[in-house]
């Protein structure tokens, strides 16, 4: 609700800004040669510019809670530079990345003997004190001439180990800046969330679940683009910060070289010892010095252009933030209307006493209580952001007043900052858990309402099914009785049929009857033929007898 609903804008706007920020190459390139030390007038102009930047950042912080990181930008960079200067080669930690050592000018290398890397003793303490004075002058509190400060040579091991510790410190500070920026955005978002009026309670219903799915998808895309943009900006910030610290260290180194050269030159002139080689190299050194001054002027112009461009981008991002806040407020009102509608439906399904008016009053009380709690939470978060800003301000004041005990105080401060970060993370986790629980409660209310309706419907359906089952069982019992009687009648009819079949013989059997008739006809015909044959046989026998008689009579007349 807090983190997801704030980023409802389409990914096109910020995606383009992120690409423009990421695609715009940094104009400041790492120079292969050593940069020249600035003039005292330029050192005086730098604190004035930084003071103007701090005033602009304070005005932006009064308008919103997103400029806390810009207020702490200059003090944190100075702290990183101090830490880089104080860390020695024997400090425990991760192995330092190999950084290119600034090449010493040939003239200075010829004049100055090589100093030992270790065993400096009081000279290192003197160098640290001088570095702190230079940083105070950069903040606008003390403006001193840098050419007259006797600084010792920066050791090669110290210069190699400083960037790694500085990178770790910058990462911790960037995490704090992200927390401050996130808390400021949450306070503005919650201030916009607490403003919906009660007149929106009877608002129009939402478009449906598809709109929320599209909104969640756009929020995820928005978060991914913001994370990518933030990572690109952090990488650019780290690289520029490391380059600036290297330039500052090498600036101190060159100022020390110039001081040593001037001191030796004055000593030789006092002793009236002519140094022809130094006189021959003086024009070359002067040309190199002027060339490096021109390079420094170009770098300052580039820095001013980059600063102006970043201010323009900051204005665009603020405008986008205002648009997002307006959309968040609109979505919050829609969510309140939807929540009221859902609660009214849930209470209507539960059939509360008092009817719709009682349910409406109870819903208004719940929403008013929730609105009050949201306002209290936004006020507490705003107070937390203000306290963090005041804490950053007090930290910057304390850093300027610290002395050699800065290391112990810095360790304590880092521990407290880590604890504060863990507490802030726990608070964010609790807020996320609270949001998840609220969503679960809403989903549970909807599920319970749906289950109650379904249970009531199933009860009525079960009663109807039971009635139908009783009727069907009665019909089955009646059918069983009828079936028993039918079987008994069937058995009686079967016995009667067998008895009648036995009595009737061929009755009803057409084929047998027809065959019987045919057989009877044939027998009659055969009997008639037999009678005719018998009569014919009798006639033949009579005729034979007559013939035989005639033959006998004939034989009797014949002579023997």
UniProtKB/Swiss-Prot annotation:
<protein>
    <recommendedName>
        <fullName>Cilia- and flagella-associated protein 184</fullName>
    </recommendedName>
</protein>
<keyword id="KW-0175">Coiled coil</keyword>
<dbReference type="GO" id="GO:0005930">
    <property type="term" value="C:axoneme"/>
</dbReference>
<dbReference type="InterPro" id="IPR051885">
    <property type="entry name" value="CC_domain-Cilium_Assoc"/>
</dbReference>
<keyword id="KW-0206">Cytoskeleton</keyword>
<comment type="function">
    <text>In complex with CFAP263, acts as a regulator of ciliary beating that connects radial spoke 3 (RS3) to the inner dynein arm (IDA) and the nexin-dynein regulatory complex (N-DRC). The complex is positioned parallel to N-DRC and forms a connection between the arch at the base of RS3, the IDA tail and N-DRC.</text>
</comment>
<feature type="compositionally biased region" description="Acidic residues">
    <location>
        <begin position="101"/>
        <end position="110"/>
    </location>
</feature>
<feature type="compositionally biased region" description="Basic and acidic residues">
    <location>
        <begin position="1"/>
        <end position="12"/>
    </location>
</feature>
<comment type="similarity">
    <text>Belongs to the CFAP184 family.</text>
</comment>
<feature type="region of interest" description="Disordered">
    <location>
        <begin position="1"/>
        <end position="209"/>
    </location>
</feature>
<keyword id="KW-0963">Cytoplasm</keyword>
<dbReference type="InterPro" id="IPR025254">
    <property type="entry name" value="CCDC113/CCDC96_CC"/>
</dbReference>
<dbReference type="GO" id="GO:0060271">
    <property type="term" value="P:cilium assembly"/>
</dbReference>
<dbReference type="GO" id="GO:0005813">
    <property type="term" value="C:centrosome"/>
</dbReference>
<feature type="compositionally biased region" description="Basic and acidic residues">
    <location>
        <begin position="127"/>
        <end position="144"/>
    </location>
</feature>
<keyword id="KW-0966">Cell projection</keyword>
<feature type="coiled-coil region">
    <location>
        <begin position="510"/>
        <end position="536"/>
    </location>
</feature>
<feature type="coiled-coil region">
    <location>
        <begin position="357"/>
        <end position="481"/>
    </location>
</feature>
<comment type="subunit">
    <text>Forms a complex with CFAP263; the interaction is required for functional activity in cilia.</text>
</comment>
<dbReference type="GO" id="GO:0036064">
    <property type="term" value="C:ciliary basal body"/>
</dbReference>
<feature type="compositionally biased region" description="Acidic residues">
    <location>
        <begin position="41"/>
        <end position="61"/>
    </location>
</feature>
<feature type="compositionally biased region" description="Basic and acidic residues">
    <location>
        <begin position="179"/>
        <end position="209"/>
    </location>
</feature>
<dbReference type="Pfam" id="PF13870">
    <property type="entry name" value="CCDC113_CCDC96_CC"/>
</dbReference>
